[in-house]
């Protein structure tokens, strides 16, 4: 199995897979993966039903959730587990949804440790609040603009 490095042309290949998931973290956006590709040595592998994205950080190999439709997620996760096993790497998943944690706990009981890494959570903003900057909560932002 050959993983390809992410480049600008990868978008066309990966786009259908990004469109097939409803994950709402920045790791599931092609632009983010492309922007950070050198820092995280991001690469991908495409199978008929799914795409696997892997990277490296501080010497540890990691993956985000497979890009797969819900009815193919079991197959994609099994593939990913085998990949890490064959490469003799510990399985390290990032940006995992609660739904997939429940799936992993059910399908692979006791196999994984689940740790919330608060430093890696995405920021979520209310668009209307940022547009108007009303209220005390946005006072510093308003003052910065003035």
Which positions does each model-derived feature cover?
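Structured loops at beta-to-helix junctions and adjacent beta-edge loops in soluble globular domains
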Residues: 6, 48, 66, 126-128
